[in-house]
């Protein structure tokens, strides 16, 4: 192989490694779910260089297929100074149809139910504390979902003190009574989202 080709090849390899070096995977053993759950973690490009900086966190449902598009959009927004750098946590939910079990609701009550209630608690009681202990996080949390998970994230608005400051709902399939409950609950929240 000519010398120039070796240099080009090495450059491509190094660029590829740096592009993917900030994306890692982890498994969290959940007592609430009674299983391990895989997550993808995306750290901002400046994370290692700025050891005193804290970052907002985006918790992403359907992280196994939404992680890369959201990561790309966040980097693009940051490049143009429209979005701050952020940590992205993608929650995997599509291995064995978990996304439907994770978002189980009682159709009569319109509330999370069975595994849906357990998954709701997993995020608030296990995942968020785990991430906040392991990484430098700012007190600004965002949650995003698509379809059934987009509807599910709105249940966090039902809490007296919502866990998240921002919600990104892509094509939500709203649970029964949700279109009435959300405006009522938002009116009760004293601290701006």
Q: What label would you give each PLM region?
A:
Residues 7-17:
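Sec-dependent N-terminal signal peptides
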Residues 22-193:
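Non-catalytic cap/lid and distal C-terminal segments of serine-dependent acyl enzymes
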Residues 1-5:
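N-terminal secretory signal peptides that target proteins for export/translocation
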